[in-house]
Amino acid sequence: MAAFRAAHRLLGHILRNESSAGLVTQRWSSSAAVASVPKSSDPKPHAQPDKRKPKTGILMLNMGGPETLDDVHGFLLRLFLDKDLMTLPAQSKLAPFIAKRRTPKIQEQYSKIGGGSPIKKWTEQQGEGMVKLLDELSPATAPHKYYIGFRYVRPLTEAAIEEMERDGVERAIAFTQYPQYSCSTTGSSLNAIYRYYNAKGTQPKMKWSVIDRWPTHPLLIQCFADHIQKELNMFPADKRGEVVILFSAHSLPMSVVNRGDPYPQEVGATVQKVMERLGFSNPYRLVWQSKVGPMAWLGPQTDESIKGLCQRGKKNILLVPIAFTSDHIETLYELDIEYAQVLAKECGVENIRRSESLNGNPLFSKALADLVLSHMKSSEICSKQLSLRCPMCVNPVCGEAKSFFTKQQQQ
């Protein structure tokens, strides 16, 4: 999953009919090992234990990923039923059919990366580091408590909201874990919050505000740059300067881009800031992965770019997942296995590596804490960008959700 942004990042895998043969199961790069996934299916939203009543609740929004192979079908079913992500004819009937048909294929892919997605594990670790820092930096708004709200797997966004209400949270911050905004990822998560209250016909007990995008936050940029430099240093010294950096993000259909989705521009802004931080040390390109179907999508595609570079004698390549902060199937399977192992061998790549995702980097938790702290100090409900609908938006719920959040009043 449009990653139609991150949700379509995964959609690329879900709809793909071709499989790669001869895959090896271990992580190819020494810099980012695949973590084992706990085999749990707790139906309750996850929040860290804390005896104190939380004053500020931070809802960490993401699409999520199946922790176990048994979770895959439910994940796919919720994904295909999400009308913010895609609209299908007779969606309530077609979605279960597609989910059932695709489950074995996607289970096979997850089995090659350890049996499930590590995204919940990383989100927990990031959240714990974030609230610990916030309690130290902002005692006036403490205790702080993080909650995880996934769109397609437990803990679901709606269940997390219920947990926050029961905890008596006074101030709720909807904090997207997508640095770059897209209507079908961050937008879908925010729509889910609005739909929750709209279905109940009640106003929130909590006062909501939103961190809806952060593509150029200085600490985010530093994290990316540090991870890239670390991986560049692993290339042979005589090849290091000619390594081509391919920043890879999930592609979007041009029909979505042409409606005015800001995702491509925001991803580009992240890339520009990262390369500035690196002093433009290497040639680079922004490329797009997970294209689905015959329609026009943002390009060039990551796999085609690898092929094209090799044909032109550029055979030292560093892949950088620039729109993904935590490892999941698109980094661990698509980038690490399909591209860095299978495709690279076919193309005759000399050296190919993948920059480690931000995962458990303490500096990244510091970035998250800084974003929340700055947001609370600003007293802003959301960014000015969030109040603006895409010029050619076709989803009326987007307008209703934006109105819901912009009308929230902070105490």
Swiss-Prot record:
The lineage of its organism: Eukaryota, Metazoa, Chordata, Craniata, Vertebrata. Its cofactor is [2Fe-2S] cluster. The gene is fech. Its main location: mitochondrion. It is a peripheral membrane protein. Coiled coil: none annotated. Belongs to the ferrochelatase family. It is found in: Mitochondrion inner membrane. The active site is at 217, 370. Catalyzes the ferrous insertion into protoporphyrin IX. This is Ferrochelatase, mitochondrial. Homodimer. Homotetramer. Residues 1-41 form a transit peptide.
